[in-house]
Amino acid sequence: MIMKVVVKVGSNLLVGSSGLRKSYIAELCREVARLKSQGHEISIITSGARAAGFTYLGKGKRTQDLHIKQALCAVGQVQLMKVYENAFDFYGIKIAQILLTRDTFSNRKRYLNLRNTLIGLSEFDVVPIVNENDTVATEEITLGDNDTLAAMFSIAWDADFLVLFTTVDGVIDENGKLVERFDESVKLKDMGKSSWGTGGIRSKIESALMASRCGVKATICSGNDVSNLTRFVKGEPVGTVFEPQGRLKAKKAWIAFLSEPAGKIYVNKGAEEALKSGNSLLPVGVTGVEGTFDVGDVVEIVNEEGELVGRGIVNYSSSDLEKIAGHKSSDLKKILGYEGNKVVVHIDNMWVA
């Protein structure tokens, strides 16, 4: 069976004291070529652009100044892609560069365009090499780290597997033992962060959980042995495994994990129970509105204690919803002056937590 596999490789594996570890990238590409020869589709989520730019320019020092970091990424991304291209050329494999920001996923139109692009690349049998577009990403639109990017990309691509490579064997519990199957009751040992990377083990766990909740089987495992990639796809126990929890439909997965909520709708206990039973949200169950949003925006639905109940695409603007909150659907025309939608958020456009 042909599988879609996403492998994420961080700076701590790709970058050494003298710059990009070209020999390591060659090993990784060899392993990807092996999987492709078996018919599988592979995408690589790569870090390393900033470090590659730093080494290539051969001057300066590490800095937190945003414009310097973005300039280093702009220079380094070219060097990074050259190394991948040269490594894959040996196997006759062509690659594509994809640079993304959070807005690519949260904006529904751009998200669908990304999915269509990936379909096209699949038809050309091209390996996507994916990174965050750090040269334009600001604090408002940054993904924060490539672990999050890997999870979001896995969901957008409808991947079967997500492999998060790290420098350790997997998730380590407070007793120093490897956690082979993850559950949220595990007490963790603090593993810290790498010198170049932005994500620690907790970031990887959150990303693996996000993917698994959308039906992607994930692992956090050692990237020092690139054969772990093939072994995991073959079904061997590798690292810390996050079992898939049922695949959400593409639209609901987007609503749940990729969209950016524009506001909140507060609901009463009766509405909360109705939503959890698979019903749509009606005006009578709404107790309050927070934020400014329009028809078609994604909103969070929260209960009276402020706990998340779900997310959904709303059929009313925040101003109109404030007017009809708590009222029966039969009262809408009198309140609004027009025949409003009887449903605030339809169950087909809703993810329930």
Curated annotation (Swiss-Prot):
Reaction equation(s) it catalyzes: L-glutamate + ATP = L-glutamyl 5-phosphate + ADP
GO cellular component: cytosol
Main location group: cytoplasm
Residues reported to bind ATP: K8, T198, G199, G200, I201, R202, S203, K204
KW Signal (keyword) present: no
CDD domains assigned to the protein according to its UniProt record, in alphabetical order: AAK_G5K_ProB, PUA_G5K
Lineage of source species: Bacteria, Thermotogati, Thermotogota, Thermotogae, Thermotogales
Any one GO molecular function term: glutamate 5-kinase activity
Gene3D superfamilies: Acetylglutamate kinase-like, PUA domain
EC primary class: transferase
Domain of life: Bacteria
InterPro entries (alphabetical): AceGlu_kinase-like_sf, Asp/Glu/Uridylate_kinase, G5K_ProB, Glu/AcGlu_kinase, Glu_5kinase, Glu_5kinase/COase_Synthase, Glutamate_5-kinase_CS, PUA
Annotated function: Catalyzes the transfer of a phosphate group to glutamate to form L-glutamate 5-phosphate.
GO biological process, one term: L-proline biosynthetic process
Name of the protein: Glutamate 5-kinase
EC numbers: 2.7.2.11
Cell compartments where the protein resides: Cytoplasm
Pathway: Amino-acid biosynthesis; L-proline biosynthesis; L-glutamate 5-semialdehyde from L-glutamate: step 1/2
Sequence positions that bind substrate: S47, D134, N146
Gene (UniProt): proB
Keywords, alphabetical: Amino-acid biosynthesis, ATP-binding, Cytoplasm, Kinase, Nucleotide-binding, Proline biosynthesis, Transferase
Domain PUA: 262-339
